[in-house]
Amino acid sequence: MSAGYRSMAISASDRERGQQSMAMLVLAALGVVYGDLGTSPLYALQEAFNGDHGVRPTPDNVVGVVSLFLWSLILMVSVKYVMVLMRADNKGEGGILALLAQITGGRSGDGRRVAVGWVLLGLAGAAMLYGDGVITPAVSVLSAMEGLQVATPALAAYVVPATVVILAMLFMIQPFGSGRVGAAFGPILAAWFVAIAALGLAQLWRNPAILQAVNPWHGIAYFQRNGFAGFVSLGAVVLCLTGAEALYADMGHFGARPIRLAWYGLALPALILSYLGQGALLLAHPQLSGRPFYSMVPEWGLLPMVALSTLATIVASQALITAVFSLTHQSAQLGFFPRVKVLHTSGSHKGQIYLPLLNWTLMLATIAVVLGFRESGKLAAAFGLAVSTTMAITTVLFAVLARRRWHWPWWAVALVAGSLFAIDLAFWLANALKFLDGGWLPLLLGLAVFCVMGCWFGGRRLQMRESRGRQLPLEALLSSLGMNPVARIPGVGVFLSERADGTPLVLLHHLKHNQALHETAILLTLQMLDVPRAAGERVSAQWLGQGMARVTARYGYMEEPDVPEAMARAAEALGLPPLEPLSTSYYLGRQTLVAAPGSGGLKRWLVGVFAFLRQNERSATLYFGLPPNRVVELGARIEL
């Protein structure tokens, strides 16, 4: 075979492999990302016509509500998330913290107070996603299992126990990773989308009058007709958007293109047909508004559809679990959350992670919610407030990013972000009226997480400020060692430092107590960047004199620091022989934190919470991959 033909064959083979890889990513993204959005037809539309705030299912109201559902999907998912926000990625990573990292990482001249304000706003939005991550698995699986009551009322007593068992099994398979889970769940959700599209299309064929809902004027007329009651029903409309924030947060797991292809190719058309089909059914049979989804299913297919919907809602839960894992990992790397154990579950896609402690915490909280509420209708009223809060904060942060980093003109920011925020605000106000109906639950969960993140962020700021005040200039230390030499012991001592300037406090304590220093002393700083993965030089090293060297290792917030690997690179850069494990010691500071005398009650509480979190976070030895038998921890008492 000639070189030209061989090159063409290799190129065609590469293209085929690339297409197969993309198809697998699209299928995995379909299974993990779109489960929550995809199963909303189970309960979303019926909430608009039932409960304390439901409207009568008259033909005009049915057309108006369905129009609101369709245009909410188009404006808030297709436009806001898929077209706009997915372009606001941070080197491939999405989510509210990716927005926050871009805003705070590029600030210049805004002042510390403004930066802290954006951080707290971003943390509040991120915290709401935890409440959503607890409630979504509960309401999704519970709503599917309640379909058993439609098929066989005698099974009603088994709905809650079966839901608990299914949720427990879902969390138990998380260690296998989102990629493997997505590969298994993708075909299930593909079948689900095809099924709901077929059911909707059958009803649409019988009653095409519902196609009027495609005209957005019917949604506007719905508000004019129903007034305040119509506005309140937006609390039900927002249920069709649950999972949109996870779509953005999961960008790092699968990439933007597979997520877009899955949305436009299957998810969006199927959702539109499903809501149109339910609307067509209600035009002919308004008395079925209590359960329009299952009413579309012929009697012979009811049990198979209940089984498929149960599988699909298991998939739906995965979207939020994956997003919460990603969010927690980003938070810890950016300094907004204590260190936790992170396991990477894929060698080819580094964004696929598993957090054991968080997984079991979510499982217990989700099961507790199921046992407490016991009905999906009660839970459906609960989590719209968390969803709309996160969506609104995301829009605000996007506006700041567009203005400060992308340098959009004010009129463009007002046109794009202002229009989206107006819709977000309407959803939020409508859901705020459901606070006493269960909306308090996600807010309570979000507030608990926000307290942890806020206290950690505030405590770290106090600690860094105190450390700067106690730090000795490095030049002074080098001068002191030159005039007053200390005993030198064989080997290498590595002293970890949070700052790349000054002298690490752990080194000062070592000199104070031991009156000796290793022949080679390395001051190591692990620098966490505000991008997902570090580009360019990973490790920089330079000699300082007196047998001391400064080493800085740079990592993105989606990477795991590996100190031994960084030190191997540093030794090569410094011209040192490979470091011998038995002659290298790592020195870490272990600080006891207390509030300074005279501190107010709020500061004492903040320092107390921060000290508790610091005491119980994952140890630096395990987190940085240090050999446990070569680590020395030196304690100190610090008043903040």
From Swiss-Prot:
Membrane-topology annotation of the record: Multi-pass membrane protein
HAMAP family on file: Kup
The keyword Transit peptide appears for this protein: no
Catalyzed reactions per annotation: K(+)(in) + H(+)(in) = K(+)(out) + H(+)(out)
Residues annotated as transmembrane: 25-45, 65-85, 115-135, 153-173, 181-201, 227-247, 263-283, 305-325, 353-373, 381-401, 410-430, 438-458
Domain of life where this protein originates: Bacteria
Keyword Transport: yes
Primary localization class, coarse: membrane
Subcellular location(s) of the protein: Cell inner membrane
Gene: kup1
Stated family: Belongs to the HAK/KUP transporter (TC 2.A.72) family.
One matching Pfam family: K_trans_C
Entry function: Transport of potassium into the cell. Likely operates as a K(+):H(+) symporter.
InterPro entries: K+_transporter, K_trans_C, K_trans_N, Kup
GO MF annotations, alphabetized: potassium ion transmembrane transporter activity; symporter activity
Name of protein: Probable potassium transport system protein Kup 1
Annotated keywords: Cell inner membrane, Cell membrane, Ion transport, Membrane, Potassium, Potassium transport, Symport, Transmembrane, Transmembrane helix, Transport
